[in-house]
Amino acid sequence: MATIHIVGAGVAGLSAAVSLTYAGRKTVLYESSNHAGGRCRSFHDTTLDRMIDNGNHLLLSGNTAVMNYLRIIGAENSLVGPENPAFHFFDLTTLERWCVRPNLGRFPWWIFSKKNRVPGSSAIDYLEAIKLATATPETLVTDVFKPQGPLFKRYWEPLAVSVLNTPADEAAAKLLWPVLLETFGRGGKYSRPLIAKIGLSNSFIDPALSYLGNAGAKIQFGARLRSVRKSKDGCTLSALNFTDGDVELGNDDTVILALPAPVLGDILKGMPSPQLHYPIVNVHFRLNAPLDSEEAINFMGVVGGTVDWLFVRDDIISVTVSAARDLAEKSTSEIIALTWSDISKALRLGESPPKLARVVKEKRATFAQTPQSLPLRAKTNTDSKNLKLAGDWTNTGLPATIEGAIRSGKAAAKAILSNNC
């Protein structure tokens, strides 16, 4: 049986491996580090003495690729969220609190209810989102949503920046339309916010590795790809050159490179790919005890300060700041002080931060999702017949999210299966 070689065991690579293994194909997965998951993983932090996620990820029940992936690997019950959609917000400038509550049906009755929408907004304000349907690749988020409008700072900007990890006045609006269409556009049933109950590895990584291992797929850690060798006619790859040796490819073998854009650019010389990236800063605080149930909202959007979103899991409070280029340049102590100041107000806690805190900076979290970057997103198929590409930065039509990463892996697998490679 032909072998499919998948290089990169992040979410995209795992998605490809799971899809191909599910279809009964023989796969080998290579990962340069000693763990799978890439930017989507959990680890034990010695400072906090707790398992924490490398980054916080908010998912929606309408993320179909995520849900299908979790179902295949047996982790469909590993996410948690409200029974009905509810998005809590806190405004640091006015100290107002509110909760956006979409109704379950497709028609958005909720925008006609003052108690279910953003304070100061009217039902007609939400119709701005329809303009996303006609957004061109050059259209910015701020071209669609008026920055001076009542919804921008309190709803559209937090949503856009968290999804695109790019400032709203630089971000490509076109990427938001499929996100809204597949979630909020289908009604509240598909827009329930979900987070990993225990951690990202427990939901997305460990069950996938178990599934692959039980199915006979091979996984090699510490395998760093240096280069690839092409056949004499240049139409196919003939070998993968790893630091510890070469892997010769059989005539019917295929390869999926599920690597970050900068890494892939070093291996496939001359291939265009997005070069500009934006960081994400996550800060984790360990409390002396879990919050009281009244205050223990799983997550909350924060506007008017440094923090974008905060997440609560047992005695750990985690915050995320997207497109955090300026914040990422600050010292650990400055970041802790700035983010805790927001948390203390949002959750009504003391002004002094807990002694146990951990700052995690992901300096190249995603590519800058700007109009200039969109044409540089790679297609699944390449000039080499037996080479496919995957990764959240490839041209999925979606932003660089977990949903996009899983779809990219599935697309690479589908390309192989449909060609009977």
Map each language-model feature to its residues.
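N-terminal Rossmann-like FAD-binding beta1-loop-alpha1 element of flavoenzymes
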Residues: 2-29
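Conserved Rossmann-like nucleotide-cofactor binding loop
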Residues: 12, 35, 262
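Glycine-rich FAD pyrophosphate-binding loop
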Residues: 21-46
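Glycine-rich active-site loop/strand segments that organize a redox cofactor
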Residues: 38-62, 128-130
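Mobile amphipathic helical/loop "lid" adjacent to a hydrophobic cofactor/ligand pocket
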Residues: 63-181, 190
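Conserved flavin/dinucleotide-binding core of flavoenzymes
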Residues: 101-103, 309-421
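Helical element adjacent to the flavin cofactor pocket in flavoenzyme catalytic cores
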Residues: 179-244
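Mid-domain catalytic core of redox enzymes
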Residues: 223-350, 377-381
